[in-house]
Amino acid sequence: MTNRKDDHIKYALDYRSPYNSFDDIELIHHSLPDYDLAEIDLSTHFAGQDFDFPFYINAMTGGSQKGKEVNEKLAQVADTCGLLFVTGSYSTALKNPDDTSYQVKKSRPHLLLATNIGLDKPYQAGLQAVRDLQPLFLQVHINLMQELLMPEGEREFRSWKKHLSDYAKKLQLPFILKEVGFGMDVKTIQTAIDLGVKTVDISGRGGTSFAYIENRRGGNRSYLNQWGQTTAQVLLNAQPLMDKVEILASGGIRHPLDIIKALVLGAKAVGLSRTMLELVEQHSVHEVIAIVNGWKEDLRLIMCALNCQTIAELRNVDYLLYGRLREGQRQ
């Protein structure tokens, strides 16, 4: 397990998607704003919580010494910058009580913390993660293609809908259903809504590719490395469901402009995984904190140029679609 978790970090950093759907979106500049820059409000609300900023550090790793080091750095960045931090899957800690790679809040009592577990795990496992870490919410990831590509992956999936229903009915804490970079299709989102899910992270293609990661770990199905739908495509497809469920976006988010574009397409907030992993691997924690704080100002700047005072107002921004993204909307 330790080697697998470390492989995930190594190969996630290696991968570069050949296409990012956010490059096919052009936002329409507004020349005469109604607001001062200081009036721009970055706050948002999802999963029953208010957050000061519309982006967060999404689930990545844990379960190894390397994972612990990464989590400590990310937690320090999140705590200092006032961002939400979601740990990687807690399943390894359930198997190993001595695993402390997720225990990042003990020295940071004010950290905005959430944790993650796979949908292959029953409700009781998620409940144990909640009891151990006391998170703001539980993120439940759905990773079908990754499981199929892993030699040691799951092969029985009939229980997944029951697990999801159990979380929706029994968990006395908000939870989010999260894809892992393959894009959550509209039918799956609707099924989740029918089962009682209130918030989903559609996590599309364009960032971390677990197909690539598992193929680098020894698989021979590299033709599936680009499996799934891109983040922007999923957001566009999910427009009819925006009033029925809270939608978060992740997958291929590189910088503040990508964050804004995802918010324009209806996301309540935006998660970053690989980008944050790369930052803490290439820079000191203090340098990353400075970069992230700079992003906050960049978001305000872009919102001012779009004449938007709040995150909700971004939904009214005009935009143009190009290339693959535009072609996808014609079908």
Curated annotation (Swiss-Prot):
**What are the required cofactors?**
FMN; NADPH; Mg(2+)
Supply one GO CC term from the record: cytoplasm
**Enzyme class, broadest EC rank:** isomerase
| Enzyme Commission number(s) from the entry | 5.3.3.2
Q: Which GO terms describe its molecular function?
A: FMN binding; isopentenyl-diphosphate delta-isomerase activity; magnesium ion binding; NADPH binding; oxidoreductase activity
**Binding-site positions, FMN:** 59-61, 89, 116, 178, 203, 208, 252-254, 273-274
Q: Which reaction does it catalyse?
A: isopentenyl diphosphate = dimethylallyl diphosphate
Task: Name where it mostly resides.
Answer: cytoplasm
Binding sites annotated in the UniProt record for Mg(2+)? 147
Please tell me where substrate binds in this chain.
Answer: 4-5, 146
Pfam families listed in its UniProt record: FMN_dh
As for subcellular location, the record says: Cytoplasm
Which keywords describe this protein according to UniProt? Cytoplasm, Flavoprotein, FMN, Isomerase, Isoprene biosynthesis, Magnesium, Metal-binding, NADP
Q: Which SUPFAM superfamilies match?
A: FMN-linked oxidoreductases
Entry keyword annotation includes Isomerase:
yes
Q: Does the keyword Magnesium apply?
A: yes
A Gene Ontology BP annotation from the UniProt entry = isoprenoid biosynthetic process
Task: Kindly give the HAMAP family that the UniProt entry links to this protein.
Answer: Idi_2
Note the subunit structure: Homooctamer. Dimer of tetramers.
Return the similarity comment: Belongs to the IPP isomerase type 2 family.
Q: What does this protein do?
A: Involved in the biosynthesis of isoprenoids. Catalyzes the 1,3-allylic rearrangement of the homoallylic substrate isopentenyl (IPP) to its allylic isomer, dimethylallyl diphosphate (DMAPP).
Task: Name it.
Answer: Isopentenyl-diphosphate delta-isomerase
Gene for this chain: fni
